[in-house]
Each structure stands twice: as structure tokens, then as C-alpha cells.
Amino acid sequence: DDCYPWEILPKIKDFILKLGPTLPKDKFDEIEKNVWVAKSAVVAKTASITGPCIIDEDTEVRHCAFIRGNALVGKHCVVGNSTELKNVILFNNVQVPHYNYVGDSILGYKSHMGAGSITSNVKSDKKLVVVKSENEAIETGLKKFGAMLGDNVEVGCGSVLNPGTVIGPNSNIYPLSSVRGIVPAGSIYKHAGEVVIKQVEE
């Protein structure tokens, strides 16, 4: 059977609850029930964190960040001012630094969301999310599913990633874009209907 990355989303909570107690106590503090924060992480006093949550080493959680639970945040990440996370995995070196909402999503290594860009995780008609490409529609069985970002994805400021968006590695999304469906790896998403493959520099 095919296996898709969004199948992980309903399992994030249980994974964190299983992993958290095994983290080395010389490197992590359980600052409150089911919230494990690396000693080398920097968390602003004004940040709000609800468990279960793991914040890994050398990550920065800035002023008024809001982590609503089921968040696995990797090493060297930035969770910025007024950014909200819920049921997410952020791989190492991810940056969501300014006014971002990331819900029911997975962000790959070194991906970056520009200021004000968000993942929209529920369809307006409240139906189950379907991932659509040019050739097929994949039923996810999920009511809440934001986006899957590959490694080194750059999302421009003010963009909306609609429910069920999948962006391949090394792709760029123009600012103020409304993105849906599958964006191939190595692409530049300019607007709906205009997605170009990056030119390889020799």
C-alpha cells in the first residue's frame, strides 16, 4: 500500500508522549506536564506552551509565540512573535518567525515561512481534505490537514497554503500566493496556473 506523510498527523501526540520521558535529563527539562524543553533552547517568558510538546536544542521561541500542543520542534528552529503552532512537526532549522499559523502540518528541514504566511488546515465546507494533483485526487480521511513542506522550501510573505497543500523540496512560493494541490520539487510557484521549474546553474 502507498504511504503518505500526512498519515503521521494523527499520531504526533502519542509519539511525543512516548518520546518525551526518554529524553536525557541532562539536556532537557520538563518545564510542566508533558512539555520538554532543551536546556539550550531560548524561550521567551511571554511565550505560551501547552503540552504535549518537545522543543529541541538551540531553538528560539520568541515573544508571544503560542504553541497549542502536539508540537515537535527540532533543533535550531525559530518560532517567532505571535506565531501559533498546533499538531505539527518542524524539522531542524525551520523558521516560522513572524505572525505565522502552522496547524496540522509538517515542515521539512530548513524550510522557511515568510511573515504572515499561514497554513489553512480546515476546508470552508468542513469536508475531508483531498490532496489534488493534475492527474489524481487522494483521499486523506482527515478533516484537519494543513500542508507538507519539503526541505529548503521558501514560502513568501502573506501566502496562504490551503488545506492539503504539498510542496516539494527546494521550491519557492511567491509572496501573497494562494497555494493548493501539489507543487513539484524544485519549482517556483508564481500564481495559480504558473509554476515553473527552476533553472539549474552550472
Annotate each predicted stretch with a short phrase.
Residues D1-N34, N170, L176, A185-S187, ...:
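Terminal amphipathic alpha-helical/low-complexity segments used for targeting or macromolecular assembly
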Residues L90-N92, P97-E202:
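Glycine-rich hexapeptide-repeat left-handed beta-helix
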Residues K27, I31-K33, G51, H63, ...:
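Short, conserved secondary-structure segments in the cores of folded domains
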Residues K27-D29, A41, A65, C77, ...:
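Short, functionally important structural connectors and interaction interfaces within domains
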Residues V37-S82:
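Glycine-rich active-site/cofactor-binding loop and its immediate structural neighborhood
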Residues I54, E84, K190-A192:
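A generic structural signal for ordered secondary structure
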